[in-house]
Each structure stands twice: as C-alpha cells, then as structure tokens.
Amino acid sequence: MLYENMSDSFLLSDAGLEFDEALLEVDQEKDDYLDDFENWTVVPVETIEGINYYPNCLPESVQRNLINNVPKELLSIYGSGKQSHLYIPFPAHINCLNDYIPSDFKQRLWKGQDAEAIIMQVYNPGDGIIPHKDLEMFGDGVAIFSFLSNTTMIFTHPELKLKSKIRLEKGSLLLMSGTARYDWFHEIPFRAGDWVMNDGEEKWVSRSQRLSVTMRRIIENHVFG
C-alpha cells in the first residue's frame, strides 16, 4: 500500500484499512501477567541478549528535518496515542533513517534490505504503551528511533520474573532482536515523568512530547484477512 505523502498515511490510518488495523494491534498486544513486581529480579539492560542501544545516533539536522516534515495533526497536543503508518517507498526525510541502522544488523536479520514498514507514534506527557511483544507478522529485528525528548522503556520477562529498564534519549536508536524481540515484553509506563539516575541518586524528570519511529520488515508471504 503506497501513499503519496505522510499526511495521506496519517489520515488513512484512521480509516480502518485492513493492513493498518493489523499494524495497530502491534502496540496493543498484551498478556495479563503483571499482577505485581514483588520478588522480581532487576537486571542490567546490557545483559538482555538482542538489545543494542546507540545514543546520539542521529545528527541534529536529520532530527530537525524529519520533525519539520511531520504532519501538524500528528504532533497535536490534543489526543493521545496518535500514529502514522508508512510503507515503502518512504519519503526521503524518513527513508534516510535506514542509513543509520547498522549494516550488520540489516545483513543478519533483514537480508541486507532496508525497513519496509514504519509506525510513527506520538507520546504526550502521561502517555505510554502497555507491555507487549511485536506481532508474528513482523520478522526478527526492530529499530526504534526517538525524537523530541527522552523517556524510559521497561523490559519484563514474566517466566523468569526479570525486569529491566533503559533510558531512550532524543536522537537515539534502540535495536531489538532474538531473545529481546521474542521473549521479553517492552512497555512505556503511563506517567508524566520518569525516575532517572543523576549523580548517584534517582530524580524525577518530567516528560515532554516524544515521537518514536519504529522500523520493521514484514514476514515474507504474510497474508492479511
């Protein structure tokens, strides 16, 4: 499904198109396992196999160019959880993000190809996303770029009762594959800020509006409907 511009994609994603509806489910899949975190073990995020994090991955010029070309309705402060779904070919200011995904990641997981499906998600202060794993219609390998501000992502492994967290900074890239993609749940808590370690102690940091760009490949021969 091809769109001439991002505005078309944003408007059509609310129209109930089958492919878009399937993609919407990606960020709404959840198992009711989180009764509480008591007796869970906190582990460093670096110990989770399949997670790679690149702070300051994107130049400021690339970040500004993308934000300047995002439809105003997507970045509106009114309403929560707004998404824009894009499929190849992407506009140039978005397609260039493929250049910042490590080539060995693409070679190993995407057969050397670029992403072919993107979800742009806006988070206003207080917004979040429930614990979930990506749908099986997506192949291994997820790339998440962060724009505008920072947030904290939580990882949980209910079978092993393990939990972890990572600070996703503006301009950063988070890669998930293998164990991190298939065995761990990830979420962004619904709250107005995050506890962040600073000078040896945790301090509450209020959130600002954030835009995430999540890039994936679709499993070959996947059929909708």
From Swiss-Prot:
Q: Which domain of life is it from?
A: Eukaryota
Q: Tell whether Iron is among the UniProt keywords.
A: yes
List, alphabetically, the Pfam families matched: 2OG-FeII_Oxy_2 (PF13532)
Gene Ontology CC terms, in alphabetical order:
chromatin; cytosol; mitochondrial matrix; nucleus
Any one of the GO BP annotations: fatty acid metabolic process
Per the UniProt record, the source organism is Schizosaccharomyces pombe (strain 972 / ATCC 24843)
According to its UniProt record, where is this protein located?
Cytoplasm; Nucleus
The family annotation for this protein states:
Belongs to the iron/ascorbate-dependent oxidoreductase family.
Q: What is this protein called?
A: Uncharacterized protein P8A3.02c
GO molecular function annotation: 2-oxoglutarate-dependent dioxygenase activity; ferrous iron binding; histone binding; L-ascorbic acid binding
- Key words, A-Z: Cytoplasm, Iron, Nucleus, Oxidoreductase, Vitamin C
- Chain ranges of the Fe2OG dioxygenase domain: 114-219
